């Protein structure tokens, strides 16, 4: 049974779990993305799942690509059942270009086009730099940064170069001021922000727009759980955020929808920060973050 959506203080509906909403209020025309196709990495859960749902509720068919075929196949069934649009699950590893080539070929064979690319696949965890292994740092860079470039390049070469399109990268604000315990993810996301600008310049003449959404703390996500969101909420840390709360997944999906659609037709090379103002005011509390890491280690 679907979880009851939350609608508080005019916030958009959302559910904490990786389930579709049983009610959705459109803020754009329901046919905004009519008959377009979106390719979404990491689309089987969290923000990626909600992005897929919201795009599909605006007339878009989707491809959700991830390493876990069983998980994304279940997600695809939910998305199609709720929205009535097609959703193709494809097993793919963003670190392996040959799997991306095969996935894009299957997408073009099935749908005949790709209009939107959402680079959402990512990996993150809290870890002091002194405890971070060489392999752990490398893995995050490979998934977040190399994965974004690999997927963007394949889709550009196979479709966007001749037909145009919109790329939206999912980033973070970690690198804006040097977030404690996040040298791996902060470095990867900073590289992605630079990549957004470079590709916007190079691919603009082909009719390709490249933009980024940088979320803050978003409830109902694996990142929220891994990065101490519940602990921060309990400790009252969100009071330092200008909007006094965490965001929800639908709010992030709406930011992506704006950048992916013709609503932002003259926007490229931009980073849209969707964090309630958190990075402007939140304390970079090293002791609190280290406390979260220590408490988790003690439970293992």
UniProtKB/Swiss-Prot annotation:
Its main location: other. Keywords: Fatty acid metabolism, Lipid metabolism, NADP, Oxidoreductase, Peroxisome. A motif (Microbody targeting signal) lies at residues 298-300. Transmembrane segments: none annotated. Signal peptide: none annotated. GO terms for biological process: fatty acid catabolic process; fatty acid metabolic process. Belongs to the short-chain dehydrogenases/reductases (SDR) family. 2,4-dienoyl-CoA reductase subfamily. PANTHER family: PEROXISOMAL 2,4-DIENOYL-COA REDUCTASE, PEROXISOMAL 2,4-DIENOYL-COA REDUCTASE [(3E)-ENOYL-COA-PRODUCING]. This is Peroxisomal 2,4-dienoyl-CoA reductase [(3E)-enoyl-CoA-producing]. It comes from Danio rerio (Zebrafish). The gene is decr2.
């Amino acid at each position: 049974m679907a979880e009851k959506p939350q609608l508080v203080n005019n916030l958009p509906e959302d559910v904490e779990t990786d389930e579709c909403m049983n009610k959705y209020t459109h803020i754009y025309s329901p046919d905004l993305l009519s008959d377009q196709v979106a390719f979404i990495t990491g689309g089987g859960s969290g923000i990626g799942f909600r992005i897929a749902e919201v795009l599909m509720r605006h007339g878009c068919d989707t491809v959700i690509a991830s390493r876990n075929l069983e998980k994304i196949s279940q997600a695809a069934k939910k998305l199609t059942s709720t929205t009535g649009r097609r959703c193709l699950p494809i097993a793919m590893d963003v670190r392996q270009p040959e799997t991306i080539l095969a996935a894009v070929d299957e997408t073009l064979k099935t749908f005949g086009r790709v209009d939107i690319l959402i680079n959402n696949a990512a990996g993150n965890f809290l870890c002091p730099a002194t405890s971070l292994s060489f392999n752990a740092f490398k893995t995050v860079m490979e998934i977040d940064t190399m994965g974004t470039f690999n997927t963007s390049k394949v889709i550009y070469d196979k479709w966007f170069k001749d037909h145009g399109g919109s790329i939206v990268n999912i980033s973070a604000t970690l690198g804006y001021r040097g977030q404690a315990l996040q040298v791996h993810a902060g470095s990867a996301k900073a590289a992605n922000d630079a990549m957004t600008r470079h590709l916007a310049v190079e691919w603009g003449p082909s009719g390709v727009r490249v933009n980024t959404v940088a979320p803050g703390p978003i409830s109902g996500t694996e990142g929220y759980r891994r990065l101490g969101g519940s602990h921060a909420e309990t400790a009252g840390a969100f009071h330092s955020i200008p909007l006094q709360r965490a965001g929800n997944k639908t709010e992030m999906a709406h930011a992506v929808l704006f950048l992916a659609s013709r609503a932002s037709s003259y926007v490229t090379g931009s980073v849209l920060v969707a964090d309630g103002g958190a990075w402007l005011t939140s304390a970079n509390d090293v002791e609190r973050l280290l406390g979260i890491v220590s408490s988790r280690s003690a439970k293992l």
